[in-house]
Amino acid sequence: MKVILKQDVKKLGTAGEVKEVSDGYARNFLIPRGIAVEASKGHMKDLELQRKQEEERQQKLKEEAEELKQKLDNEKVVIYQKTGDEGKLFGSVTNKDVAEELKSKGYTVEKKKIEMEPIKSLGTHKVHVKLHPEVTVDIDVQVSEKK
């Protein structure tokens, strides 16, 4: 019997895949638990529609990420931190600090998308921002002394 998986199933497949399984496995386990539905023509059409919608959504997200990349390309972020005697920072500059500074400039970037090691010295540093799995941008972060 062919079924469409609604969830990921170990050793069988991932959600949205059409799989051939034994009748008993489908009727007694997968379908009653809501893990799968029978692969009828109606369900197959629904699956195709969902795939198209997901594709369009992903394309839209990628286009938005490309637009944001264009805006961030020449952006320079300046962060002021307290320093010690020899220019050493008290603490460090993290992705949270960079995200907050970008937010204050009108850009919405989640801190988890900013890939960086904590910055512990003054100067200009390159920071990698992953806007989308296929779209990344490097921005300059200048750490200056707070007076």
Swiss-Prot record:
One of its GO terms (cellular component) is ribosome. One of its GO terms (biological process) is translation. GO terms for molecular function: rRNA binding; structural constituent of ribosome. Keywords: Ribonucleoprotein, Ribosomal protein, RNA-binding, rRNA-binding. InterPro entries: Ribosomal_bL9 (IPR000244), Ribosomal_bL9/RNase_H1_N (IPR009027), Ribosomal_bL9_bac/chp (IPR020594), Ribosomal_bL9_C (IPR020069), Ribosomal_bL9_C_sf (IPR036791), Ribosomal_bL9_N (IPR020070), Ribosomal_bL9_N_sf (IPR036935). It holds the Pfam family Ribosomal_L9_N. Belongs to the bacterial ribosomal protein bL9 family. Binds to the 23S rRNA. HAMAP family: Ribosomal_bL9. This is Large ribosomal subunit protein bL9. It comes from Natranaerobius thermophilus (strain ATCC BAA-1301 / DSM 18059 / JW/NM-WN-LF). The lineage of its organism: Bacteria, Bacillati, Bacillota, Clostridia, Natranaerobiales. The gene is rplI.
